[in-house]
Amino acid sequence: MKVELHSHTMRYSGCAVSTPAQLMTALVKQKYDAVYLTEHDAVWDDWELDNLRRDFPGLRIFPGVELTLPHDDHLLVLGTNDREYLTLRHPELILAKARQAKHLTVLAHPFRWPKAHSLLETGPLPDALESRTHNSDAHAGEQSQAVARQHHLPLVNAGDTHAADTLGHFWIDTYADLVTGGEIYDIVTNGMYENAMKKRK
């Protein structure tokens, strides 16, 4: 399955420029099979997700969130819209809750700015690191790869998509179907996927 792990819409992310419908339309056009909605410090309610799924029945739409941590690093929590995550301030509590529930945690764009990888220095560690995204260049990807080797963490490509017209540069292809959003935990932690990127012309 072609999967977008990291996406934003105008509904809940002020930095995004596409509506949910615009983003879903672009995902379908580019033959994505699944997407995680990871708004900044906000989650979609179940009824909102259900409405979006009805409008785009060929796309598997899953919840998630991008949390801003105290040192300004960002953590994706995938497969959940549990609002308790929005109230937790300490990374230790967030990661403990996620691990117990098997919600995949991914340190987003860890080398996009100086403090974006603070969690790797203070611990505890997330389940995975982002490697390449639309907003992280090849050098940042190389830095992520080096740190992932050091800590024995999986790497995932993601769009970090804020606009429909920037979609389709980086994603993962999974070896197994995602039926529920939570299944991404086992897929990534067991290496049942490949990182993919748009081929240069």
Regions found by a protein language model. Give the residues of each.
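Short acidic, glycine/proline-enriched helix-loop-strand junctions
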Residues: 44-62, 151-156
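Divalent metal-dependent hydrolysis catalytic cores, especially in the metallo-beta-lactamase
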Residues: 4, 8, 25-44, 104-106
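Surface-exposed amphipathic alpha-helices with a cationic face
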Residues: 2, 28, 50-54, 90-106, ...
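Charged catalytic cores and adjacent phosphate/nucleic-acid-binding surfaces used
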Residues: 1-5, 9, 13, 21-25, ...
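Short, well-ordered coil/turn segments that N-cap beta-strands
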Residues: 1, 31-34, 57-61, 101-104, ...
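Divalent metal-binding pocket/active-site signature
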Residues: 17, 42-43, 71, 81-119
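A short, structured active-site edge motif that brings together acidic residues
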Residues: 62-69
